[in-house]
From Swiss-Prot:
The gene is kdsA. This is 2-dehydro-3-deoxyphosphooctonate aldolase. The keyword Acetylation does not apply. It comes from Shewanella amazonensis (strain ATCC BAA-1098 / SB2B). GO terms for molecular function: 3-deoxy-8-phosphooctulonate synthase activity. Belongs to the KdsA family. It is found in: Cytoplasm. Keywords: Cytoplasm, Lipopolysaccharide biosynthesis, Transferase. Pathway: Carbohydrate biosynthesis; 3-deoxy-D-manno-octulosonate biosynthesis; 3-deoxy-D-manno-octulosonate from D-ribulose 5-phosphate: step 2/3; Bacterial outer membrane biogenesis; lipopolysaccharide biosynthesis. The keyword Transferase applies. Its EC number is 2.5.1.55. GO terms for cellular component: cytoplasm. It catalyses: D-arabinose 5-phosphate + phosphoenolpyruvate + H2O = 3-deoxy-alpha-D-manno-2-octulosonate-8-phosphate + phosphate. One of its GO terms (biological process) is keto-3-deoxy-D-manno-octulosonic acid biosynthetic process. It comes from the Bacteria.
Length: 282
């Protein structure tokens, strides 16, 4: 197995490199909040020496309720992303939901994300691939790890091999997700960079009357377990007031705990990647 390295400017994304943080907020709530959250992430990651990519969504198109907040939309969202990029000189990742969004988003954003619920939509995959951007594929909650190869093959055949695979939990009965650590290792065998969405994996889908619940109190334990696998990156969302966040607050980290949280993740990553490779199949 060869390990694929994706180069994003001076950031190397690979399973054998120091982990990259893909972090920010769930959805753009306002320009000012996005700027302040990006500034906090950048301050902490620079202090800890962690490569960093800012994440937020301009539209949450799969909310539980039609009345739930979705975001500012693509046009306004891209303006905010451009300002964050210009102000902080930080790369960006965001998700798209329709083929027509791909080209304009790729003009501003460095990594385009394929949402888990849409990962088998061929027209969307082709449109994303044709931008030439780096692609982050969220593993659907309903697919086995080995089935990710079909999605990767679609991207490859559409002309794009700059692919990151992201674990975000698997359905376990009703209203619950679990994380299969061996499944993440299985995805690593593809050679592609694997990252762990440790906060969305805390979701309890449909856990509230009209929105998803979550288990924020277990955010540290779950992320440490994932980092022990030796991954290319960690994907998290934080908020200064999670209980009043407009989307997925029950899963969001309190922003004031970001430095302490990431210090632990970096320590685990550094330790695991200092070990020599050990093949126990022989």
């Amino acid at each position: 197995m060869s390990i694929k390295t994706i180069q994003l400017g001076d950031i190397a994304i690979a399973n054998d490199k120091p982990f990259v943080l893909f972090g920010g907020m769930n959805v753009l709530e306002s320009r000012d909040l996005a700027m302040s959250i990006a500034e906090k992430y950048l301050e902490v990651t620079q202090k800890l020496g962690i490569p960093y990519v800012f994440k937020a969504s301009f539209d949450k198109a799969n909310r539980s309720s039609i009345n739930s907040y979705r975001g500012p939309g693509m046009e306004e969202g891209l303006k905010i992303f451009q300002e964050i990029k210009d102000t902080f000189n930080v790369p960006l990742i965001t998700d798209v939901h329709e083929p027509h969004q791909c080209a304009p988003v790729a003009e501003v954003v460095d990594i385009i994300q394929l949402p888990a619920f849409l990962a088998r939509q061929t027209d969307l995959v082709i449109a994303m691939a044709r931008t030439g951007a780096i692609i982050n594929v969220k593993k659907p909650q309903f697919l086995a790890p080995h089935e990710m190869r079909h999605i990767v093959k679609k991207f490859n055949e559409a002309g794009n091999d700059e692919i990151i695979l992201c674990e975000r939990g698997s359905c376990f009965g009703y209203n619950n997700l679990v994380v299969d650590m061996l499944g993440m290792d299985e995805m690593k065998q593809s050679g592609y960079p694997v990252i762990f969405d440790a906060t969305h994996a805390l979701q309890r889908p449909g856990g509230r009357e009209d929105s998803a619940g979550g288990r924020r109190a277990q955010a540290t334990e779950l992320a440490r377990s994932g980092m022990a696998l030796g991954l290319a990156g960690l994907f998290i969302e934080a908020h200064p007031d999670p209980d009043n966040a407009k989307c997925d607050g029950p899963c969001a980290l309190p922003l004031h705990q970001l430095e302490a949280y990431l210090s632990q993740m970096k320590a685990v990553d550094d330790l695991v990647k200092s070990f020599p490779a050990l093949d126990t199949s022989k």
